[in-house]
């Protein structure tokens, strides 16, 4: 059965492991992304070089913005990028196509870059500047933007990395010479340039592999949640007595007045923290400094997160598919109607999970999976062999439904996978499938609930 890069291109997965690359799925995006801090924190010369290339481009953007060169044409040329979907990472609802970086991001970033990177190249508190700082200011730049921007700036490195492996390990019949757009930046021409590569090629597109040791899950090492959560400790560590006193004084003023012995809510504290950071952006530099001083922690946490994704979506899914092949006719159901196929497959899933130890693959370190998003990805990865089109979470105007299974426009069944632990399970059962069936123009709907006793 073909699910992963190694399956589709006929190589041993151990070859990827030896090379240091993640064995991506070519069925659905997996929830990982590049953390630029891992380049900075690495001792590898090639990673240090890529970190410096990112800083060089940020310096270029800042200098142009300071000269007022941030009109619509330059924003389009220098800030707007398509998602590098060929790496098969991210949180795409269907397959591997995300939204990328549009004009809204470009305007937000270009108008604030001189504030975010005020000491770029002249750092006194921190060792270096970091792209992730843009996500710490309230300027409309989120972690998804940081991820897409990082991947585009590392595009040439990733393509070289993939080409080197492909030429050595993959049969030539699976390779193709591809002219890739916007690969490297020419500082003389001040434009992004294309470049040719020999790459793995399937379904009318090339594929990119990524080193595991620059990947993470959920959050970058430098992130706004840690900034807010560690606010008091960070500010306490500031050695400048006057600055530290001014910060805490301003923070107290930003908290709403309360009666004696009445505590502030977390929402009130978060709002006051954000106002204080806007007033004293120096706080961010001290936060980044602490992060820089814990490179080992960044590496260790990222490794654990990547290993978790590998366990859930590669090792466990592979074992689950083997169980389905051995214990059921899951992949042998004749295509009669979308409803029949969906129902039969769900019954097979139920039987293998409950009676053939399949449930064990939904546990990690003795704990059941807690995110429905993970359950949905697992479901799609096991369904790939169907003759029917299975689209994950289509949004037809009424909100997302987990799957719409169809054999042409006249034969559709909506399928929802839910965890019994979901606090909104009752509301979902009462309303959502009916609404989704109407939105998807079908009378067929199935809800499957995974319950851990």
Give short role names for the model-derived ranges.
Residues 1-48, 267-290, 300, 304-308, ...:
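N-terminal start-of-domain structural block
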Residues 175-187, 399-401:
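Beta-rich nucleic-acid/ligand-interaction surfaces
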Residues 184-385:
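The feature marks a conserved, polyanion-engaging helical scaffold used by nucleic-acid processing enzymes
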Residues 117-135, 309-323, 407-435:
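Generic detector of solvent-exposed, compositionally biased contiguous segments
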